[in-house]
Every structure is written in structure tokens, then in C-alpha cells.
Swiss-Prot record:
Gene Ontology molecular function: any one: glutaminase activity
Enzyme active site: C245, H330, E332
Recorded catalytic activity of this chain's protein: hydrogencarbonate + L-glutamine + 2 ATP + H2O = carbamoyl phosphate + L-glutamate + 2 ADP + phosphate + 2 H(+)
Organism: Bacillus cereus (strain ZK / E33L)
Pathway annotation: Amino-acid biosynthesis; L-arginine biosynthesis; carbamoyl phosphate from bicarbonate: step 1/1; Pyrimidine metabolism; UMP biosynthesis via de novo pathway; (S)-dihydroorotate from bicarbonate: step 1/3
Enzyme class: ligase
Protein name in UniProt: Carbamoyl phosphate synthase small chain
SMART domains: CPSase_sm_chain
Entry binding sites for L-glutamine: S45, G218, G220, L246, Q249, N287, G289, Y290
Segments of this protein annotated with the region CPSase: 1-166, 1-169
Length: 365
């Protein structure tokens, strides 16, 4: 079955269709991960995107029940050079092709993914549509140019609060499109977690008496989530806070800094990040299309703690006065290296120190 990818600039790439027999549009991006395709397609941060894999063979270990980062996949399509039809792994339960058919997600194989990746790197991310061969190219191009992809966080965030009980510190996890890996890391440390929707107010969060607040990853432009920015303005300084990815960007906006869209984003499992204070470099998992503008941090109460070695963009922030820090990358990995996993320990240490300071103030009052 032939299928084509039509880009907003009129480029047409023809290959072999697999997965769902459905047409879908989305922002065409690329990821450099050699493995972790199951985590990628189930990562809510990819909501509404058509993901191109630069690694030439995808699907060789199939799909299993353990590696999902969300219950429902949020990607709008997959593009690969070659898909493996006969996966081999002791955990395999279903092939990638069959899984995409079940979930009605279209795929395209047999195209030059290196050519497509170079195009995205040169011109930036492009809107595109995976469609059948009888599609009207001119009409689709006109539709793509007029399309604006918004409200992704609203689509992937939980609709209702729910608990993930533990005996340790109570952490309110604000879900902007949370990967399950973040929740797993908190559960490992016996945190008493309450997951809340993206539009939960500061008053509602504080009513839960949290020891700490965690801001999850999520898709899209952080400026599309004004409710969260307003919530954070009222939260910062009252409770220890740790943010990841979109949570990092929202924290920056709430603190007076600015964000902007990257040309082609950071998506992959091998991005080097430097800790400015120690000089140490961690290899990190990343997935974001926006970043905090370095110059916008200068007139705020924030300091830059980490930078990307590939392009110098901001990868970490810390508040100068209050117990709050954030990172642009994914310390929980899932998939990817676990070089930065100790940030969860830093968060819990910050909570304990904040509690001790509060107890000392009460004793001295």
C-alpha cells in the first residue's frame, strides 16, 4: 500500500504505508534515539506530532506491556526508513505495525529519512500530512499552511485528580502530559503522590498540604497554558518545587523570563548537558521544541544552572531566593540514560531542608 507525506512547502515523499489506514496531519519532527520507540510513541510530549526516526530500522523488538509512558499514544504518525515485520524479543507481545493498526496511527516506511531530517534541520519543523495517493496536493498544502496546532496539554492532561499513595513526602504532581516514568521515580522513593490536572489552581494545590510540588513534562508551547503560569506565580516560594521539560518552561515564564520556539527542537536520548557549577556533563534524554531565552533570565530572580553543549541553550534553572529548580531534559529518562536521575534525590533533600527551616522558625518564634 503506497502512502505519501505532504509537507506545507509542497514537498511530497512517497513510501509504503503501515499501521492505521487513516490520514492525519501534524508537526513533522525527528528523534535521534536508536531505541525507545515504544516510549516515544506513548510520550504525551509528542502529542499531535508526526515523528521521524533517524535510526534506519525501527520495530525490531516489538511492543511489550511494560514500556509505555502513557495509556494512550498521542503521536499523529510515525515515519521510518524500514519497519521490522518480524520482531524478536522475549518481552514482545505485538508488532509495532499491528499496534499502530489497533490504535489507528498511520505510518510511512521506505523513504529517505536522512533527507527529511536534513530538511527539518535546514528549514525548521514543518507541518505535514500522511495521506493516500489520491490526495489533492495543492489543497492539502493550503490547509497545512492555515493550520495551527494548539490545546495539546488540555488533550493529554488527566481530567481528574488521583492518588498514588506512599508513606513518604506528599508530592503534588501537576500533569501537563506526564510520562509515567516521573511517577515511577517518585513511587520508588515512597512519595505520597497526588496527580492533578494542568488547570488546578494554587489554592486547590495548597489545600492538599503538599511537602513539594512537581511540574511534569508536556507538549506544545508553554504560553498556551496561561492557567499554569498564573498558578505558579502564587505557588513559587510557598512550597519546594521541581519542574521538568514543559514544567521548566512554565516556571521560567511565571518568574519573568521568556521562551521561544527552537528551529527543530531537541529530541533524542544522547544530548550532552553541562552543570555550570561543577563542570560535569550528563548525557540526557530530551524532547522539546521550545526553550527558555538566555538573555531573558538576566533581570529575574533565576539563575541558569545547566546548558546544552550542542547549541548552548538553557537546560536548567534555580530560584535565587526560594526552594525551586527545574530542568529542560528528562532525569527519569524512559527511555534513555539515567545520568541525571539523582535530581529526584535533590528534590527530596530540598523538601527536608525546607521542613527543618520551618520547624526552626516555629521554635524560635
Amino acid at each position: 500500500m503506497k502512502r505519501q507525506l505532504i509537507l506545507e512547502d509542497g514537498t511530497v515523499l512517497i513510501g509504503t504505508g503501515f499501521g492505521g489506514e487513516i490520514e492525519k496531519s501534524g508537526e513533522v519532527v525527528f528523534t535521534t534515539g536508536m531505541t525507545g520507540y515504544q516510549e516515544t510513541l506513548s510520550d504525551p510530549s509528542y502529542c499531535g506530532q508526526i515523528v521521524t526516526f533517524t535510526y534506519p530500522l525501527i520495530g525490531n523488538y516489538g511492543i511489550n506491556r511494560d514500556d509505555f509512558e502513557s495509556i494512550h499514544p498521542s503521536v499523529n504518525g510515525l515515519i521510518v526508513n524500514e519497519i521490522c515485520d518480524h520482531p524478536s524479543n522475549f518481552r514482545n507481545e505485538i508488532s509495532l505495525n499491528d499496534y499502530l493498526k489497533e490504535r489507528k496511527i498511520p505510518g510511512l516506511a521506505g523513504i529517505d529519512t536522512r533527507k527529511l531530517t536534513r530538511k527539518i534541520r535546514q528549514y525548521g519543523t514543518l507541518r505535514g500530512r500522511l495521506c493516500n495517493m489520491d490526495a489533492d496536493v495543492e489543497y492539502i498544502v493550503s490547509q497545512l499552511k492555515a493550520t495551527v496546532f494548539t490545546d495539546h496539554v488540555k488533550r493529554v492532561s488527566t481530567k481528574d485528580p488521583y492518588p498514588s499513595p506512599g508513606r513518604g513526602h506528599r508530592v503534588v504532581l501537576v500533569d501537563f502530559g506526564m510520562k509515567h516514568g516521573i511517577l515511577r521515580e517518585l513511587n520508588k522513593r515512597d512519595c505520597d503522590v497526588i496527580v492533578v490536572p494542568y488547570n488546578t489552581t494554587a489554592e486547590e494545590i495548597l489545600r492538599l498540604s503538599p511537602d513539594g510540588i512537581m511540574l511534569s513534562n508536556g507538549p506544545g508551547d508553554p504560553k498556551d497554558v496561561p492557567e499554569a503560569i498564573e498558578m505558579l506565580k502564587d505557588i513559587i516560594g510557598k512550597v519546594p518545587l521541581f519542574g521538568i521539560c514543559l514544567g521548566h518552561q512554565l516556571f521560567a515564564l511565571a518568574s519573568g523570563a521568556n521562551t521561544s520556539k527552537l528551529k527543530f527542537g531537541h529530541r533524542g536520548l544522547n544530548h550532552p548537558v553541562k552543570n555550570i557549577a561543577t563542570g560535569k556533563v550528563a548525557i540526557t534524554s530530551q524532547n522539546h521544541g521550545y526553550a527558555v531565552e538566555e538573555e531573558s533570565v538576566e533581570n529575574t530572580e533565576l539563575e541558569i544552572t545547566h546548558v546544552a553543549l550542542n547549541d548552548g541553550t538553557v537546560e536548567g534553572l534555580r530560584h535565587k531566593k526560594f526552594p525551586a529548580f527545574t530542568v529542560q531534559y528528562h532525569p527519569e529518562a524512559s527511555a534513555g540514560p539515567e545520568d541525571a536521575n539523582d535530581l529526584f534525590e535533590d528534590f527530596l533533600t530540598m523538601i527536608e531542608n525546607f521542613k527543618k527551616e520551618g520547624e526552626e522558625l516555629c521554635q524560635n518564634a
